Design a protein with these regions (language model features):
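Extracellular/periplasmic carbohydrate-active domains that bind, remodel
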Residues: 2, 7-493
């Protein structure tokens, strides 16, 4: 037998830094509202200088849980925080916000969430327990400048953090997270690690944040984005998202609940589907961001969208595998939606993007890779290396003749613009594009060119190999200057 002696001082520290919610009146039967008791435990813990609030095994029906600085909310294995239904009136009301014209209610309000914190330091949510959104709404009916309806007055996020510093979320699972399973806005020093999220709308949104790491996580979102860096106007100012690392993650678009139960039922491809996307909200922009060692399954592809006047600079994407991809495998665009005050918007900047070591199998025939600016404003300094894509194919001659519309001020979603006239790569309004060791294959014959480039200055293609139908052009160049093709099988009849 091994005996452990704990000093009186250590015993005092242990007894005063751990707070079990059961000791504050939490029942954990899934019927009684327990958030009042949990909030009492959090308040007492904070009054003692901080520590760990323990939620032991049980089902805890809750409205809004309010985090405080220096608190670790620990969900033990078997513990479930269950979101109350709207008619129970258990969620905090949304806070006042000076201007709702430039973002929807989901990005405007934080207090009407299942777990929320604002202006906090040193907070964490950890443990092997689960957050089950239950009664959270996933609707988004707020209109620009009119945030009534939809999620207002109900709970709409599982975890919402605003202007917090030194944040850790680790090991927990989230099911049915509402409009956002996790939304962090204006936060610094964020770690999200080993999370499992199975929800209907957005999984993880990192908005106007700095120094964030998302790692070793599985995020399933059949009807919205899985991991979505943004830089909205939710702080009533422009703020860039920068120094971001997303690594060792699996994103997917299976039906909600089928990631957790193991059945992995494919969801019908829709508006957006289980992807990693930068944007659409992009007032501040994105700088010094890395996505590495990630897997996309039954989802849309990677999207980099800069459309609200900010800057996108120094982005590296590497070591990515995609299978059963809808709509497109890679989408890089500069647009002019300019959702924000007129004195803060204008044409944005997209430059210095490196994408390498990408493998895509069974990509949709709607569109290949798209890299587009707008007339007079160019996407600049883009490198694609070691990219291998198997497309479904099946495009016809009419598709190949189609005049592809400019994005202009429209919402940047490729399927809204229709079938692309190139099956592999469409480039327009770009300066300095390098393609090295690129392979495009089609599972069925495709009568569209593999590559179309328009209004490009500085284009280098080296070791580019593509499938092409007999007698059809493999590439089309219009208004392309400083073109260099070598070691490639590209033909033009």
């Amino acid at each position: 037998m091994i005996s452990i002696n704990i000093s009186p001082l250590m015993a005092q520290i242990v007894s005063t830094s751990f707070f079990n919610v059961r000791n504050f009146g939490a029942v954990g039967d899934g019927k009684h509202l327990d958030h009042v008791a949990i909030n009492k435990a959090i308040t007492k813990c904070a009054e003692r200088g901080g520590g760990t609030v323990i939620v032991p095994s049980g089902n805890y029906l809750c409205g809004s849980i309010r985090l405080k600085s220096n608190i670790n909310l620990y969900l033990d294995a078997g513990a479930v925080i269950l979101g109350a239904q709207p008619e129970m009136n258990a969620y905090d009301p949304p806070e006042e916000f000076p201007d709702t014209a430039y973002q929807d209610g989901g990005h405007t309000y934080f207090h009407n969430s299942l777990i929320w914190g604002e202006n906090l330091k040193n907070i964490s949510i950890t443990g092997r327990g689960m957050i089950n959104g239950g009664g959270l709404t996933s609707k988004d009916k707020e209109h620009l400048g009119d945030p009534t309806g939809g999620s207002i007055g109900t709970g709409d996020k599982a975890i919402a953090l605003k202007l917090c510093t030194n944040v850790l979320i680790r090991d927990i699972s989230i099911f049915h997270g509402g409009h956002f399973a996790i939304l962090a806005t204006g936060c610094d020093l964020i770690t999200m690690d080993n999370l499992t999220i199975d929800t209907n709308r957005d999984g993880i949104d990192i908005d106007c944040c700095t120094n964030a790491v998302i790692s070793n996580s599985r995020v399933n979102c059949p009807n919205d984005d899985a991991i979505c860096p943004k830089s909205s106007y939710a702080l009533n100012r422009k703020q860039i998202t920068e120094n971001l690392l997303i690594t060792n993650c699996i994103v997917s678009g299976f039906k909600e609940g089928t990631l957790l139960n193991g059945t992995r039922i494919p969801a019908k491809a829709g508006w957006s589907n289980g992807r990693i996307k930068f944007g659409t909200e992009s007032n501040g922009g994105f700088r010094n961001c890395v996505v590495s060692n990630c897997v996309f399954k039954n989802s849309n592809g990677l999207a980099l969208e800069q459309v609200d006047g900010g800057i996108m600079d120094n982005i590296i994407i590497s070591n990515v595998i995609m299978t059963d991809v809808s709509h497109y495998p890679i989408y890089i665009t500069l647009g002019k939606r300019n959702r924000g005050p007129k004195n803060t918007t204008g044409m944005g900047i997209v430059k210095n993007i490196l994408i390498s070591n990408i493998r895509v199998d069974n990509a949709d025939s709607l569109s290949g890779i798209q890299i587009t600016g707008v007339p007079g404003y160019y996407v600049e300094n883009i490198q694609l290396r070691d990219v291998y894509i198997n497309y479904k194919g099946g495009g016809n001659k009419n598709d190949a003749k189609r005049i592809f519309p400019e994005l202009d001020g429209r919402y940047p979603e490729p399927f809204l613009l229709g079938v692309n006239p190139a099956y592999g790569l469409f480039v327009r309004h770009v300066k300095n594009l390098e393609l090295t060791n690129i392979r495009f294959q089609t599972l069925k014959p495709d009568l569209r060119p593999a590559i179309i480039c328009e209004d490009v200055d500085g284009l280098e293609l080296n070791y580019v190999k593509v499938s092409k139908a007999s007698g059809m052009d493999s590439y089309v160049m219009k208004n392309v200057k400083n073109l260099n093709i070598k070691n490639s099988n590209l033909q033009n009849y």
